[in-house]
Amino acid sequence: MEVFKNVVCPFCGTLCDDIEVLVENNHVVGTRNACRIGNAKFMHFEGAIRHESPLMRENKKDDFKKVDYETATEETARLLVEAKLPLIYGWSSAECHAQQLGVLLAEKTKAIVDNTASVUHGPSLLAVQDVGYPVSTLGETKNRADVVLFWGSNPMHAHPRHMSRYSVFPRGFFRQRGKQDRQMIVVDPRKTDTAKLADIHLQVEPHKDYELVSALRAAAKGFNIEAEQVAGVPTETIYEAVDICKNAQFGSLFFAMGVTMSRGKHRIIDNAIQFVIDMNAYTKFVLTPMRGHYNVNGFNQVSTWVTGYPYGVDFSRGYPRYNPGETASNDVLQRGDTDMMINVASDAGAHFPQKAVQHMAKIPLVCIDPHETPSSVISNIVLPPAITGLEVSGTAYRMDGVPIELRKVIKAPEGMLSDAEIMKMLIKKVDEMK
């Protein structure tokens, strides 16, 4: 049995890089240090329905037929070239080189390229563009933070090692006693497992986050809040939370989809960032979005470097345009604008609204995914890639914007191509057809 040390876990945005993977006869038989979700990521592909070769069918009611990569990519390229407005969506579980090639493919085919941020942390990116990004690395939080604030976030379930590795429990350079040296504030409508560990739980009413942030900012600036409670939180608790934040040596605010998908969307995050800026008049305070997929941040970084825009980039006029609400994947699907779609390293069929999925079922759909998913079931073509972070190396961006190299621990099935190799084939075929 071979033990691979310091392997990066390709599941969530925490990108834990201390995993040990146990390999026997080119099969993963176990892991060490990984959380339950990370362990399942390394182990589940053994039991999941995995596509061994590309599949094709003309009619979605027919059965799939096995073909080779050459045939499948040629048909995909033909569909791309003939489409009036193709959509290339996903990318959050692919490595950065494949993402960069995907943006190039979208440019060549005058497509819309979008990633899963448009249905999760898209509002965060809009807010950052509006008012700034007072961010730090997770290492700084671990070593310096004595106040940690989780807003609309439940890392105990969503990012299980976040609190133990970076934010609350670890012993840092200036926080030698770990949790004893830190105070923890949680803002959540429910008494989550994370909230149960908090020193202060601000149990905000659903969709009242904007009011609560505004009250925190007012209290921080010395205004007298006349109401007995704001957004369901007692005024005295608001003042207590603000005092803790003001007196911190280093404060760190982590926010997740509880905020981005609350009523007000990016305007709430605008306000939260302004609260962090206000706090910097008294102490050092930073914020970090709790990104979900392990490389959702990577696509936003790559797309911004290449096109100037983080997601929902429309190349239909030959140059990049960006207008979330018009050019994002859900918008074009629900309006019925797109006439061909490629789903890459994500599962739109499982997570998009019914109206969007109904349109996906009507149009030619290509799925680039190693396993059977609700998206692949309604596809015309399935192009299975090798699994990044397990069978292929590459680069991914952690939630705080730190790039980390993913490792290869086992060999991919014979003849299986990586996401980047599939993209290269598609670009070559498109160039030949144009």
From Swiss-Prot:
Pathway: One-carbon metabolism; methanogenesis from CO(2); 5,10-methenyl-5,6,7,8-tetrahydromethanopterin from CO(2): step 1/3. This is Tungsten-containing formylmethanofuran dehydrogenase 2 subunit B. The gene is fwdB. It comes from the Archaea. Catalyzes the reversible oxidation of CO(2) and methanofuran (MFR) to N-formylmethanofuran (CHO-MFR). This enzyme is oxygen-labile. It catalyses: N-formylmethanofuran + 2 oxidized [2Fe-2S]-[ferredoxin] + H2O = methanofuran + 2 reduced [2Fe-2S]-[ferredoxin] + CO2 + H(+). One of its GO terms (cellular component) is membrane. It comes from Methanococcus maripaludis (strain DSM 14266 / JCM 13030 / NBRC 101832 / S2 / LL). Belongs to the FwdB family. Its EC number is 1.2.7.12. It holds the Pfam family Molybdopterin. GO terms for biological process: methanogenesis, from carbon dioxide; respiratory electron transport chain. It is an enzyme of class 1 (oxidoreductase). The keyword Acetylation does not apply. The keyword Oxidoreductase applies.
